């Protein structure tokens, strides 16, 4: 099972976020008790099922002589990672540091990205989807992926 689709949600005043039922089901199928990791990257908060996160972290930590930029990336992504389990109501708590990094306000969008999901501020996400993606479809075609409708 992969994370797909979008879900519009609201953060409560304590930073709690109700996960969509489909996302909760995926977490429960991929990790004991629905354990997950939240971290920040690319202007949003990123959620991984715990086993997928451990695999990513292990691969990253095996890099030999990482560049300064890679070490800084590790500080942001791994240093900012927070393990958690959803509460009985299916909520996770997004930390103040993640909310600040991603500019999250009350209205957010959860976006499935296959093995992970992203949490975007609604207005930032609206700007992303309003872009013209013609150049991306050309790039996909050059990579052998036909994405024409």
Curated annotation (Swiss-Prot):
Organism: Nitratidesulfovibrio vulgaris (strain ATCC 29579 / DSM 644 / CCUG 34227 / NCIMB 8303 / VKM B-1760 / Hildenborough) (Desulfovibrio vulgaris)
Keywords in alphabetical order: Cytoplasm, DNA-binding, Repeat, Transcription, Transcription regulation
Family membership noted in the UniProt record: Belongs to the MraZ family.
One matching Pfam family: MraZ
Chief location of this protein within or outside the cell: cytoplasm
InterPro entries: MraZ (IPR003444), MraZ_C (IPR035644), MraZ_dom (IPR020603), MraZ_N (IPR035642), MraZ_sf (IPR038619), SpoVT-AbrB_dom (IPR007159), SpoVT-AbrB_sf (IPR037914)
Residue span(s) of domain SpoVT-AbrB: 6-52, 81-124
Keyword DNA-binding: yes
A cellular-component GO term for this protein: cytoplasm
Protein name, entry field: Transcriptional regulator MraZ
One term of GO molecular function: transcription cis-regulatory region binding
Assembly and oligomerization: Forms oligomers.
Compartments where located: Cytoplasm, Nucleoid
Designated gene of the protein: mraZ
PANTHER family with a match to the protein in the record: TRANSCRIPTIONAL REGULATOR MRAZ
GO biological process, one term: negative regulation of DNA-templated transcription initiation
Keyword Transcription regulation: yes
């Amino acid at each position: 099972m992969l994370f797909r689709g979008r879900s519009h949600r609201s953060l409560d005043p304590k930073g709690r976020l109700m996960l969509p039922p489909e996302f909760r089901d995926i977490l429960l199928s991929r990790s004991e008790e629905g354990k997950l990791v939240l971290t920040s990257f690319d202007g949003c908060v990123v959620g991984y099922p715990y086993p997928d996160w451990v695999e990513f972290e292990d691969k990253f930590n095996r890099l030999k002589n990482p560049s300064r930029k890679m070490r800084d990336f590790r500080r942001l992504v791994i240093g900012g990672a927070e393990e958690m389990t959803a509460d009985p109501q299916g909520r996770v708590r997004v930390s103040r540091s993640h909310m600040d990094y991603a500019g999250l306000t009350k209205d957010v969008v959860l976006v499935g990205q296959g093995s992970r999901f992203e949490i975007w501020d609604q207005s930032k996400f609206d700007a992303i989807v309003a872009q013209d993606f013609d150049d991306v479809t050309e790039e996909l075609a050059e990579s052998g992926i036909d994405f024409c409708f």
